[in-house]
């Protein structure tokens, strides 16, 4: 399993290349389509992402692409699964697996990310569809009092549990603890929260025996 994870990491981290986030949810991509007068149907989304992934030379600059679950199951006009369209260009297919955020109970203003239930079984399907890495995003609202320790600990534990499940299934995890930058706090407060959040995340990763060499950290 470690050799599989190492091969994926090396492919994702090709020098001079980056990761493309193409994992917009249906509501998000609907807003973008509406701005250019396009109705957001499943066929329109399939055609758009097919065009994107088949762009000649894309693999010269992009080493991995994060896909939405819908996209992973779609095919190009010639019947080729879109994950394979990406792979043929040397682009590693990945998938966003979290189910979004909700309010954290007994923690006003804080949020927690959902999606751990049944994750291992979902990975079994995603791997057959070509996914080799995954992404999970935790969101931290910032103010003079936020995030609270409960939110930092709960989200860190969820990120670590997700990462451990990923590695157990041969999937490289992208761990994304996003400290939001749209509040009215100053940069010093943002730095303070970021340090605390990353500390909690890496303590949790260690508790869950996540191999750091086989994961990617995506900070804000």
Language-model features and meaning:
Residues 38, 50-60, 164, 168, ...:
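Generic secondary-structure signature for well-ordered alpha-helical cores
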Residues 208-220:
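Catalytic alpha/beta core domains of metabolic enzymes, predominantly
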Residues 1-129, 142:
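Alpha/beta catalytic barrel-like cores
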Residues 92, 172, 214-216:
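Proline-centered loop/turn at the N-terminus of a beta-strand
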Residues 119-204:
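Helix-rich catalytic cores of soluble enzyme domains
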Residues 102, 192-193, 217:
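Domain-level signal for soluble alpha/beta catalytic cores
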């Amino acid at each position: 399993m470690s050799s599989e994870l190492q091969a994926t990491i090396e492919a994702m981290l090709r020098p001079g290349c980056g990761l493309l986030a193409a994992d917009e949810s249906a509501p998000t991509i609907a807003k973008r389509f509406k701005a250019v007068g396009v109705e957001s149907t499943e066929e329109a989304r399939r055609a758009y992402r097919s065009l994107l992934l088949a762009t000649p030379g894309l693999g010269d600059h992009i080493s991995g692409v994060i896909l939405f679950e819908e996209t992973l199951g779609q095919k190009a006009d010639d019947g080729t699964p879109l994950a394979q369209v990406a792979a043929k260009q040397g682009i590693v297919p990945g998938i966003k697996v979290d189910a979004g955020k909700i309010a954290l109970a007994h923690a006003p203003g804080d949020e927690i990310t959902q999606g751990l239930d049944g994750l291992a079984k979902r990975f079994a399907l995603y791997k057959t569809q070509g996914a080799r890495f995954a992404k999970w995003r935790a969101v931290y609202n910032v103010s003079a009092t936020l995030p609270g320790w409960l939110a930092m600990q709960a989200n860190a534990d969820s990120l670590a549990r997700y990462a451990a499940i990923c590695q157990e299934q041969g999937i490289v995890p992208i761990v994304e603890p996003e400290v939001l930058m749209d509040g009215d706090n100053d940069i010093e407060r943002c730095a303070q929260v970021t340090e605390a959040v990353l500390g909690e995340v890496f303590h949790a990763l260690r508790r869950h025996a996540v191999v750091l060499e086989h994961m990617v950290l995506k900070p804000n």
